[in-house]
């Protein structure tokens, strides 16, 4: 199973912790690099306007058919119509279908113009970057897109996006399809709501700009992250809108939040805690802030709860602006093994 990287991976365009996404491709055991002796690869993209009408029709028809299967909860037929690596590890997509079935039932769909991606070469491409559409002197235009996908075997692929409306909420469903003879098989399944905690990308953008104008850059940065995440249907897609938001966010990025593997140290109750991640998370109708920190052992729940509480209070003391942006804070103590212990504290209870 492979996870598609964002076009601006250092910024984490999509918070992978919120919601679940599945994209499966046949992967090599080792990462492939390019060296003077490595055969060249070609990677090309055709927009809907560039491809043959028969190809576009086939892609749109396949996407509609797979949506209908998803709305019925027909995971068996979806699995039969998947590429072999996906079918052999189908639990993630099956869970996603079940999770989204209620939102799909009775909904109406509109298929966006699809993209056709081609990888030529003798072996899988470790990092395929597809530039789709017309680019200007400053980069992307309103009709362009960039996709970055890892470990793609030579083949033809499509990214086909559906707007799903009329169900529980407005959302997108993105299929990655791979050509197999005359068929287009399922290679990836991504469902994503257009809102977080009841708000869309525009709302988060406006709030981020308000925070930035008030020099609340920590809040601005985190809200920009949500705006960017909501502005593209999938992590591995970049558009003019996401690029512009990214540039705005960079101007507000604080230097004292943990990013790109760095840590932030806070002191609480005579102990130093190493914070590794801080990010927003929707919990029901609330937007909370999650903070992860390093812990040696989380087997003692009572002690871990006390340490979580200490970290939460220390974080909000250090950054009091969080009080106006988030309903609560979730602290997660994480062992080196990855096992963790989490607890939530409402902002009104943080004294």
Regions found by a protein language model. Give the residues of each.
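Short beta-strand edge/turn micro-motifs at domain boundaries
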Residues: 43, 152, 156-199, 280-303, ...
């Amino acid at each position: 199973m492979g996870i598609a990287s964002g076009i601006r991976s250092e910024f984490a365009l999509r918070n992978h912790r919120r919601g679940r996404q599945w994209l499966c491709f046949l992967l090599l055991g080792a990462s492939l690099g390019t060296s003077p002796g490595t055969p060249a690869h070609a990677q090309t993209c055709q927009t809907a306007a560039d491809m043959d009408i028969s190809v576009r029709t086939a892609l749109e028809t396949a996407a509609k058919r797979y949506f209908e299967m998803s709305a019925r909860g027909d995971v068996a037929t979806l699995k039969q119509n998947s590429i072999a690596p996906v079918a052999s590890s189908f639990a993630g997509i099956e869970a996603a279908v079940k999770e989204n079935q209620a939102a799909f039932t009775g909904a109406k769909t509109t298929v966006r113009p699809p993209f056709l991606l081609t990888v030529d070469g003798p072996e899988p491409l470790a990092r395929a970057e597809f530039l789709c559409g017309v680019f200007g002197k400053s980069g992307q235009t309103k009709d362009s897109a960039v996709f970055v996908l890892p470990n793609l075997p030579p083949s033809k692929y499509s990214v086909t996006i559906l707007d799903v409306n009329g169900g529980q909420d407005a959302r997108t469903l993105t299929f990655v399809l791979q050509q197999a003879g005359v068929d287009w098989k399922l290679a990836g399944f991504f469902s994503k709501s257009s809102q977080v905690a009841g708000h869309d990308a525009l709302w988060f953008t406006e709030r981020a700009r308000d925070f930035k104008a008030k020099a609340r850059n920590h809040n601005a940065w985190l809200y920009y992250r949500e705006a960017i995440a909501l502005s593209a249907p999938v992590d591995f897609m970049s558009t003019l809108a996401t690029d512009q938001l990214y540039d705005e966010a960079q101007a507000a990025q604080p230097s004292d939040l943990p990013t790109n593997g760095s840590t932030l140290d806070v002191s609480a109750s005579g102990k130093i805690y190493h914070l590794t991640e801080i990010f927003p998370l929707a919990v029901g109708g609330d937007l909370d802030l999650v903070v992860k920190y390093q812990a040696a052992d989380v087997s003692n729940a009572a002690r871990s709860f006390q340490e979580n509480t200490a970290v939460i209070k220390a974080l909000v003391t250090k950054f009091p602006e969080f009080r106006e942006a988030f309903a609560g804070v979730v602290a997660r103590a994480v062992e080196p093994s990855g096992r963790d212990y989490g607890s939530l504290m409402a902002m009104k209870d943080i004294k």
